[in-house]
């Protein structure tokens, strides 16, 4: 089984689920025009802070100059990486097998999974067209929060929600839900299917091949 990007059944929403497989792309969506203020809350404010940083980089005319694409990408990856908890996402996506891994295997898996998630990054930057976003509300329960938004593009409205975990000093994203489809759950289903008939080493091999394709010029 080949590892794929996130997907939903409606073809109309395919591109948005592709965005869900690129973390920077997701943030770029939210850097559009906010048509409704977000409900006040720590998690929402954390997302706003990251979104503002992303928007600043995306709109920087100097970084749009030929030859500076790699620099812009690295800056965006840094900003997104500060908000998204790739290790927590990896742990949840892999499920129970995570607890059996060595620290070395965990580190390798996180790095490969992060590359997979950010694989469609460049395309999302180029495709960004200033979609509007409606901020709906924030729901919190102890150390967990969900910031609910809706992307407005033409006549289509697509629910886009961020699930965050309070890490003590900041809120970090551990899942993204596009039109009711959890990114983490989607990958957990794929990984579980692979591991039912193959070894963890086989899964890593597939991730390495996918990563090499993503990094290829």
Language model features by range: what are they?
Residues 17-27:
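Sec-dependent N-terminal signal peptides
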Residues 157-185:
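Short beta-strand edge/turn micro-motifs at domain boundaries
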Residues 178-217:
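Low-complexity, intrinsically disordered terminal/linker segments enriched in charged
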Residues 119-158, 210-217:
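Surface-exposed, charged secondary-structure patches
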Residues 39, 58-62, 195-196, 202-204:
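Short hydrophobic alpha-helices and adjacent helix-cap/hinge residues
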Residues 1-17:
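N-terminal secretory signal peptides that target proteins for export/translocation
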Residues 28-37:
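C-terminal segment of classical bacterial N-terminal signal peptides
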Residues 42-117, 121:
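Early exported N-terminus immediately downstream of N-terminal targeting peptides
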């Amino acid at each position: 089984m080949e590892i794929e990007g996130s997907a939903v059944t409606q073809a109309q929403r395919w591109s948005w689920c592709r965005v869900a497989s690129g973390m920077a792309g997701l943030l770029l969506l939210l850097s559009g025009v906010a048509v409704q203020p977000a409900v006040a809350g720590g998690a929402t404010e954390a997302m706003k802070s990251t979104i503002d940083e992303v928007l600043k980089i995306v709109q920087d005319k100097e970084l749009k100059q030929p030859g500076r694409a790699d620099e812009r990408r690295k800056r965006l990856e840094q900003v997104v990486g500060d908000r998204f908890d790739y290790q927590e996402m990896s742990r949840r996506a892999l499920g129970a097998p995570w607890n059996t891994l060595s620290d070395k295997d965990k580190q390798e898996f996180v790095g490969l999974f992060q590359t997979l998630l950010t694989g469609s990054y460049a395309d999302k930057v180029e495709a960004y067209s200033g979609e509007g976003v409606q901020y709906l509300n924030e729901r919190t329960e102890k150390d967990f929060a969900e910031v609910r938004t809706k992307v407005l593009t033409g006549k289509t409205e697509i629910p886009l929600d961020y699930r965050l975990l309070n890490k003590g000093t900041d809120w970090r994203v551990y899942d993204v839900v596009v039109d009711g489809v959890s990114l983490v759950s989607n990958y957990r289903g794929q990984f579980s299917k692979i591991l039912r008939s193959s070894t963890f080493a086989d899964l890593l091999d597939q991730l390495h091949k996918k990563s090499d394709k993503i990094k290829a010029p």
